[in-house]
From Swiss-Prot:
This is N-acetyl-gamma-glutamyl-phosphate reductase. PROSITE patterns: ARGC. The keyword Oxidoreductase applies. Catalyzes the NADPH-dependent reduction of N-acetyl-5-glutamyl phosphate to yield N-acetyl-L-glutamate 5-semialdehyde. Pathway: Amino-acid biosynthesis; L-arginine biosynthesis; N(2)-acetyl-L-ornithine from L-glutamate: step 3/4. The gene is argC. NCBIfam families: argC. InterPro entries: AGPR_AS (IPR023013), AGPR_type-1 (IPR000706), NAD(P)-bd_dom_sf (IPR036291), NAGSA_dehydrogenase (IPR050085), Semialdehyde_DH_NAD-bd (IPR000534). The lineage of its organism: Bacteria, Bacillati, Bacillota, Bacilli, Bacillales. The keyword Oxidoreductase applies. It comes from Staphylococcus saprophyticus subsp. saprophyticus (strain ATCC 15305 / DSM 20229 / NCIMB 8711 / NCTC 7292 / S-41). It comes from the Bacteria. Pfam families: Semialdhyde_dh (PF01118), Semialdhyde_dhC_1 (PF22698). One of its GO terms (cellular component) is cytoplasm. The active site is at C147. GO terms for biological process: L-arginine biosynthetic process.
């Protein structure tokens, strides 16, 4: 049994961590930190957690004694605290973007904030769980991937890895629910602004664009650029990413479908849909699954991939726990066996 703490405990990502970790057989939640809710019972903020007796605490790195700290905070928080915690040999799983990008200048361009020191960016293990090499002996700091990159990279990984696509014209059209914007008030997520509305945002400058490009470039061993456009849709949870990519070999639908089935055969959280079927966001709601549908336009050899995840689970807290399991050598689905909630 290990003891963990959660920083940012009043946000959606943290609440999902709590929901999942209280069901984990190998984890005890010792701390839940929130600067804005100090000393308040958690059930006052979230009445659906009436059974929990935790009170929010203020983070003081000197007095913390536990095995792992999860940061479920916005960017520009964890990078100021993580060095002190690492010096105490506390392992970190950071759900924010502070340690995802290895290039400080790129971070500062897209996030508009000063980057973490290069020492800690180099130490961080960016961990798409399906391809992770984390372990308890050598891994101290995990940069948990973002939601859009998770949905996108799981779909693209087999094609880039097998070098069967043209890497200069990857188009990603992604839709997300409003929980991805967090709990803070903002005009674009007010009901009157969002309801019966669909909008593209952060075109060409979304923080997840360089994250996707960084991972694909490392995998391809050459620079990969993408065209990435996110859209906000009037639903609470979910991401649907539709990806268009030119193939550099002649493939039939059956060929590409079989490639994906073989590639993900031993990955419990990636489900490849039957040929001709495509996933919907409701079909992974509340779960750690990523469902992928595949189509080949055989006339012009373009692959069209449809990937769906729950942005708060596989796109955040669920993958963080999956990475925790991998780090400690537990079965990666430990504590993550929840079926999707439907309808």
């Amino acid at each position: 049994m290990i003891e963990v703490g959660i920083v940012g405990g009043s946000g959606y990502g943290a609440i999902e961590l709590i929901r999942l970790l209280i069901q984990h057989p190998n984890v005890n939640i010792k701390y839940i930190f929130s600067h804005s809710k100090q000393d308040q019972p958690i059930k006052e903020t979230f009445p659906h957690l009436e059974q929990l007796t935790y009170h929010y605490e203020t983070l003081n790195s000197e007095g913390i004694e536990c095995d792992v700290i999860f940061f479920a905070t916005p960017s520009n928080v964890s990078k100021h605290i993580v060095p002190q915690l690492l010096s105490k040999r506390i392992k970190i799983i950071d759900l924010s973007g502070d340690f995802r990008l290895t290039n400080r200048a790129t971070y500062e361009t897209y996030y508009g904030e000063t980057a973490a020191s290069q020492e800690y960016l180099n130490e961080a293990n960016y961990s798409i769980a399906e391809w992770s090499n984390v372990n308890a002996q050598t891994t101290q700091l995990i940069a948990n991937p973002g939601c859009f990159p998770t949905a996108t990279l799981l779909a693209l990984h087999p094609l880039i890895d097998k070098d069967i696509v043209k890497q200069d014209n990857i188009i990603i059209d992604a839709k997300t629910g409003v929980s991805g914007a967090g709990r803070s008030l903002a005009q674009h997520v007010h009901f009157a602004e969002m309801n019966e509305n669909l909008s593209a945002y952060a075109i060409g400058k979304h923080k997840h664009k360089p994250e996707i490009e960084q991972y694909l470039s490392l995998l391809a061993q050459q620079e990969v650029k993408v065209t990435f456009t996110p859209h906000l849709v009037p639903m609470t949870r979910g991401i649907l990413s539709t990806i268009y990519i030119k193939l550099n070999h002649a493939f039939t639908n059956e060929d590409l479908h079989n490639l994906f089935k073989d590639y993900y055969e031993d990955k419990p959280f990636v489900r490849i849909r039957s040929l001709g079927q495509f996933p919907k966001t409701k079909e992974v709601y509340g779960s750690n699954y990523c469902d992928i549908g595949i189509y080949v336009d055989e006339e012009n050899q373009t692959a069209i991939l449809v990937s769906v995840i729950d942005n708060l689970v596989k796109g955040a807290s669920g993958q963080a726990i999956q990475n925790l399991n991998l780090m400690y050598g537990w079965k990666e689905n430990t504590g993550l066996l929840q079926s999707p909630v439907y309808p």
